[in-house]
Amino acid sequence: MNYADDFVGCFQYKSDAEQFYERVKHRMGYFGLSLEEEKSRLIEFGRFAQEKCAKRGTKPETFAFLGFTHYCSQGKNWKFRVKRKTSRNKFAKKCKEVHRLIGSMRTLTMKEIILRLNSRLTGYYHYYGITDNTPGVKKFRYNVLKSLFYWINRKSQKQSYNWNELLNNAFRKEPGAGKPHVWFLGEVHLIKGASTRPGKKRHLPEI
């Protein structure tokens, strides 16, 4: 049996939030469960909280939920809107995971490394590639490139790539094949003999 171990309750009035908090603890105790006090808290959040904090010269609190930091901000029309970005802890964890992943693949060819990276990164961007999180996505891409640059240059004592070479396209041609293999190292994508129909463009997902 799986339990939902994270949840967020939203209330307009502080008294309602406090009452809910106490009732949840009582209800969970009935089933022999308890709240993690260190991870449970009441915060002032939302449009009214932003207005109050502006008068006090402070910023509203933020909270982390499901890998995202939720914070008060404004949309393009200057109206209040909750925005989300990758939480600091999750970002650091994912960067370390990818760094170790690339390190474990350093004996493979560049083609194999990029193919495996694509599979991992596709899942990352399907989850974290949401509205307002573009800066976080680009930052993650940059860290992936740094890790790739670090590990491919450890494969031999002589440096394999400089930074500019890594950001530019590296072209390879398979022996006896008529179509070139194009490695988009700057985007960490591999295209093998890609072709498109006339009048249509092939769009690659950003990393």
Regions picked out by a protein language model, each given a short descriptive name:
Residues 1-207:
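Non-catalytic terminal/accessory segments
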